[in-house]
Amino acid sequence: MARHPRWTLSQVTELFGKPLLELLFEAQQIHRQHFDPQQVQVSTLLSIKTGACPEDCKYCPQSSRYKTGLEAERLMEVEQVLDSARKAKNAGSTRFCMGAAWRNPHERDMPYLEKIVQGVKAMGLETCMTLGMLNESQAQRLANAGLDYYNHNLDTSPEFYGNIITTRTYQERLDTLEKVREAGIKVCSGGIVGLGETVTDRAGLLLQLANLPTPPESVPINMLVKVKGTPLADNDDVDAFDFIRTIAVARIMMPTSYVRLSAGREQMNEQTQAMCFMAGANSIFYGCKLLTTPNPAEDKDLQLFRKLGLNPQQTRVLAGDNEQQQRLEQTLMTPDTDDYYNAAAL
């Protein structure tokens, strides 16, 4: 028997058509029913493998098809990733996200990925990865390693998707999300505002996300970062109120999900970000760079938090994590142990 969708396109379109202040009021009420309005979840994102991606996503400077001046980099060493995670934790992040610019991981990559998940988890951080498409075995191996979240964005509506990406189908994205969910990993999935889509496309994106069998636990909403050399470099700027409206609708449709202000915050002033938090955003990426694009410096974010009376959300760290971390890091970085993994050898 087919599952009845939670939302219809007409309902979502009606939300987008509401007066902005009325929409914000509704979103804030729903937000307060499920979250502490003063708490913001803080994540850090690291590119563990940069550039030379075979996909043709028109917004992405990491695609090998576009001349953006980005230099490709090989997989980072395990100890480099763990050092970055340690710095992120010391700076206040509670979740460490790792991204690799490829279509999908190969089997030879899995031991490396498992080791860094285990190493970051041992620090008491939540873990997230974005690695492209996964098969069932890969999703289960990451779950067994302790991965908390897997990010795989839908980007836009099914109807507009073909204008942005041709090397991967929308259904393939949905299939990956299903495999991740079946493996027991939490889902992180959102999209991008500013690709040239219509309001109906924005409604269609949120409709897809909210009507998944289980909505994503984390929903990143990105504002397009226009990069010279990509096909979308000359797109029109996104109106701030349109972006805020998208955040509010996401909050109303997915009341228990974390809604993250993701890429594009460097282009937003403090007032726009404040209204996004009022609209129900309660998660940010923290650090000077998101994969390859600029992000506000940590100090700037902390100043904004103080102005707004916001606090970084804390996670509970189990006793013994520090000892576990030391043992695991020693094992991972000692060449004569069975668990040692040298990424440069790939």
Swiss-Prot record:
Please give the Gene Ontology molecular function terms for this protein: 2 iron, 2 sulfur cluster binding; 4 iron, 4 sulfur cluster binding; biotin synthase activity; iron ion binding
Gene3D superfamilies reported in the protein's UniProt record: Aldolase class I
* Catalytic reaction(s) noted: (4R,5S)-dethiobiotin + (sulfur carrier)-SH + 2 reduced [2Fe-2S]-[ferredoxin] + 2 S-adenosyl-L-methionine = (sulfur carrier)-H + biotin + 2 5'-deoxyadenosine + 2 L-methionine + 2 oxidized [2Fe-2S]-[ferredoxin]
Question: Which residues bind [4Fe-4S] cluster per the record?
Answer: 53, 57, 60
Keyword Hydrolase, does the record have it? no
Residues bound to [2Fe-2S] cluster are 97, 128, 188, 260
Q: What class of enzyme is it?
A: transferase
In which domain of life is the source organism classified? Bacteria
Task: Enumerate the UniProt keywords alphabetically.
Answer: 2Fe-2S, 4Fe-4S, Biotin biosynthesis, Iron, Iron-sulfur, Metal-binding, S-adenosyl-L-methionine, Transferase
* Recorded coiled-coil stretches: none
> What Enzyme Commission number does this protein have?
2.8.1.6
Biological processes, Gene Ontology terms: biotin biosynthetic process
Q: In what residue span(s) does the Radical SAM core domain sit?
A: 38-256
Q: Which metal ions or organic cofactors does this protein require, according to UniProt?
A: [4Fe-4S] cluster; [2Fe-2S] cluster
Cofactor binding: number and manner = Binds 1 [4Fe-4S] cluster. The cluster is coordinated with 3 cysteines and an exchangeable S-adenosyl-L-methionine. Binds 1 [2Fe-2S] cluster. The cluster is coordinated with 3 cysteines and 1 arginine.
Q: Mind telling me which PANTHER family this protein's record contains? A: BIOTIN SYNTHASE (PTHR22976), BIOTIN SYNTHASE, MITOCHONDRIAL (PTHR22976:SF2)
**What does the UniProt function comment say about this protein?**
Catalyzes the conversion of dethiobiotin (DTB) to biotin by the insertion of a sulfur atom into dethiobiotin via a radical-based mechanism.
Which family, according to UniProt? Belongs to the radical SAM superfamily. Biotin synthase family.
Q: How does it assemble?
A: Homodimer.
**Name of the protein in question:** Biotin synthase
Gene name, per UniProt, is bioB
